């Protein structure tokens, strides 16, 4: 893969690109990284590359030097990426996609940004490495190169590690252990010592799911949502469907205080508390019955529920989420794409609720 970096400070990249895995990949010609100084395309005697914006504020990179620099290295198969906090978030999935490209041109942001006309004319995609602002786009460019290079065959000593690493299946990696078996009174989990590979794989998945739920609810929500999309039945291979009809489903929710839980659900979903007793059904959906069972806190089992809501519009979906928070529940994460909106919430007893609403086509 060839990568051209366009920056005001090409010397910034010398150290990272000459050491460790990236340095070795460049020496082995798995990566061909070239640096271009934007100032070489500056205007006038002083090679001016920036100017004051018409809207006021800090300096901007001018359109002409930027477009000239890009066009000097652009080929027919090039993909131009502007590293910007306004771009789509860099993910493992996006890194894998970019690794399939033959030529990337990375435009590093400087000052307060770049004249929009240069972006509209030359940039194929804007990418961000997170919701924060850096001193220059060179840092972001290095992050992208490092993330992408892992998926280029031969860059890693063991390519399988790229597939197994954290985030590759949408989850954080779980805890890992090495010798000794016991350290300061803490022992390695017994399941890892028994040699049962199936049990170990199951344990690792469970630990990854738990850690992701606790530390990155946004990733956990996306993981569950994508998994629900992937788990579809093949109409042609599914037989005797008529023999497996379900009239009603009952879900038991263990709660600390029955009255408190009942009041919460009734207020959120607009139900009559007097008629609910210790069970309730959601409005317009009578096939699922939620039973509330009062238990002691230490004996309570936490469950995760996923509900696809039939709302008239996205505003109605957001209204439900506001009611959830208003009456004491927690809204942990909310995401959206062109197909759906979904949210991860937590009720008063710690049960996880995944609400989704699919946009009409």
UniProtKB/Swiss-Prot annotation:
S-adenosyl-L-methionine binds at residues 109, 129-134. The keyword Transmembrane helix does not apply. This is tRNA (guanine-N(1)-)-methyltransferase. Its EC number is 2.1.1.228. It catalyses: guanosine(37) in tRNA + S-adenosyl-L-methionine = N(1)-methylguanosine(37) in tRNA + S-adenosyl-L-homocysteine + H(+). GO terms for molecular function: tRNA (guanine(37)-N1)-methyltransferase activity. Specifically methylates guanosine-37 in various tRNAs. Gene3D superfamilies: 2,3-Dihydroxybiphenyl 1,2-Dioxygenase, domain 1, 3.40.1280.10, tRNA(m1g37)methyltransferase, domain 2. Its main location: cytoplasm. It is found in: Cytoplasm. Belongs to the RNA methyltransferase TrmD family. It holds the Pfam family tRNA_m1G_MT. It is an enzyme of class 2 (transferase). The keyword S-adenosyl-L-methionine applies. Keywords: Cytoplasm, Methyltransferase, S-adenosyl-L-methionine, Transferase, tRNA processing. GO terms for cellular component: cytosol. Homodimer. Disulfide bonds: none annotated. One of its GO terms (biological process) is tRNA N1-guanine methylation. InterPro entries: Alpha/beta_knot_MTases, Glyas_Bleomycin-R_OHBP_Dase, tRNA_m1G_MeTrfase_C_sf, tRNA_m1G_MeTrfase_TrmD, tRNA_m1G_MTases_N, tRNA_MeTrfase_TRMD/TRM10.
